[in-house]
Amino acid sequence: MVVGLFGGSFNPPHAGHALVAEIALRRLGLDQLWWMVTPGNPLKSRSELASLEDRIAACERLVSDPRIKVTAFEKSLGISYTANTLAKVKAKNPHVRFIWIMGADNLKSFHRWQKWREIAETFPIAVIDRPGSTLSYLSSTMAQAFSQARIDEDDAGVLWKKKAPAWVFIHGPRSTLSSTALRNNHK
């Protein structure tokens, strides 16, 4: 089984997140996508963070594809770093092939994540295009550090067969929606 792991605060989740999930399912040939709602992000302020329960419920309302499973298994870990969470997921599911999925906007700061190199060396990564990120991702620390591991977008459907480090940048429809902008509009 091939599973995409799509993690984030989703504060709030929106149609742009659903679009990323849809693109990942289609282009990566996933059997499932686990939408991992995190209790908190160590790189972001918690002051405007909606409750985990509210964010999970909002994600579940947004999701219509039965292959997408909204999960909050990080809840038992508290605020966890992605590398630790992914290691636990992999250990509990040794026969599943995982792909880490993220929006291109996160690629610019990926090098600030704890154990980011370990993530890239353990999981194939699919980076989904976002407005304003298409060109800047090429100069990101991660893109440069793992430039030799980048596969052609036409091969995205076989990313799961690649041994990490391996990553792909996927172009496609982009949503201008932003959780930050949505929160700011509701102030």
Curated annotation (Swiss-Prot):
- The gene name on file is nadD
EC number per UniProt: 2.7.7.18
Q: What does this protein do, in the record's words? A: Catalyzes the reversible adenylation of nicotinate mononucleotide (NaMN) to nicotinic acid adenine dinucleotide (NaAD).
GO MF terms here are: ATP binding; nicotinate-nucleotide adenylyltransferase activity
Q: Which UniProt keywords apply?
A: ATP-binding, NAD, Nucleotide-binding, Nucleotidyltransferase, Pyridine nucleotide biosynthesis, Transferase
- Is ATP-binding there in the keyword field? yes
Q: Which Pfam families match?
A: CTP_transf_like
EC class name: transferase
Q: Per the UniProt entry, what is one GO biological process?
A: NAD biosynthetic process
Record the organism: Agrobacterium fabrum (strain C58 / ATCC 33970) (Agrobacterium tumefaciens (strain C58))
Question: Which residues are listed as membrane-spanning?
Answer: none
At the top level, the lineage of the source is Bacteria
What name does the UniProt record give this protein? Probable nicotinate-nucleotide adenylyltransferase
Quote the pathway field.
Answer: Cofactor biosynthesis; NAD(+) biosynthesis; deamido-NAD(+) from nicotinate D-ribonucleotide: step 1/1
The record's comment on protein family reads: Belongs to the NadD family.
- For the keyword Lipid metabolism, the answer is no
What's the catalysed reaction? nicotinate beta-D-ribonucleotide + ATP + H(+) = deamido-NAD(+) + diphosphate
